[in-house]
Each structure stands twice: as structure tokens, then as C-alpha cells.
Amino acid sequence: MPRRREVPKRVILPDPKYNDKTVAKLINILMVGGKKSVAESILYRALDIVESKSGEEAVKALKKCLDNIKPALEVKSRRVGGSTYQVPVEVRPDRRVSLAMRWLIKYSAARSEKTMTEKMAGEILDAFNSRGAAVKKREDTHKMAEANRAFAHYRW
């Protein structure tokens, strides 16, 4: 824990197209090398594809997709008496969103479609329907936490 003052959270302005902070945050995480316009075009085109395929509003579909990816529990390493235990802990709300967005982008990039737009749209649709690699990552994280439930009393 830092002993100095707490650093204030930066205010993120909503994105211009959907006027939504979640979309703006996802664009910022998707951005590589400061190329925001590229990240915006990838995400906006992906959301257009999602809207046409799912029939649901793009932002609503994205938020439902992120809700399906957000982990409730995770494991953290804790060293006790010479051995390291994987201790299950609850995930803070802001970290849940952050992890969900990172996993969405990571597993989108790993897909086999041609362009990042198609990959992103495919992963959003899969997560929207509670399947896909990002949702599997969440399930695996929960399984790890459940398997190490015996060490829950080591929480700090």
C-alpha cells in the first residue's frame, strides 16, 4: 500500500458515436501505439456487425457481453510459512470491468477470422450468448477459486 496520497481516477469522456463511457474505455484499451482513430473504427464497425446480427442495440449487447465475462472471484498468491497458496478473493468492481475488457480483446485477437473487426464482433456475439473463449476464461477463473476454497481463511 502506498503511504502517500491516493491518486485520483482520471475522468474518461464518453465516446462521440454512442455517448457511452464503457465504449470509450474499451476503445482506450483496444488502442495500440496511440492510434485512437484505428481503435475507434475497429470497435464501431464491430458493434455495427453485432447490431445487425443480434438485432439488439450495440451498446446493450456490449454491456451484456461484458457482464457475461466479468469474474466475481479470482485467486491471488499468498506466501505462508514457506509455501505459496492460491487464495480466492473477491474481485473489485472496477477490476471486474477492466479484466472483462482485457479478456475480450485478448481472445478476440486470438480468433481465426480475417480482420480484427470481424474477430471482435465474433467474440462479442459469443460472449453475448454466454460462450466463447473470454467466457471460458471467466469459468476457469471461478473453478480455480472454487478449487482453492480451503485456503479462503488466508485472505487479507
UniProtKB/Swiss-Prot annotation:
GO terms for molecular function: rRNA binding; structural constituent of ribosome; tRNA binding. InterPro entries: Ribosomal_uS7 (IPR000235), Ribosomal_uS7_bac/org-type (IPR005717), Ribosomal_uS7_CS (IPR020606), Ribosomal_uS7_dom (IPR023798), Ribosomal_uS7_dom_sf (IPR036823). The keyword Ribonucleoprotein applies. Keywords: Ribonucleoprotein, Ribosomal protein, RNA-binding, rRNA-binding, tRNA-binding. The keyword Ion transport does not apply. Disulfide bonds: none annotated. Belongs to the universal ribosomal protein uS7 family. This is Small ribosomal subunit protein uS7. The lineage of its organism: Bacteria, Pseudomonadati, Thermodesulfobacteriota, Desulfuromonadia, Geobacterales. The gene is rpsG.
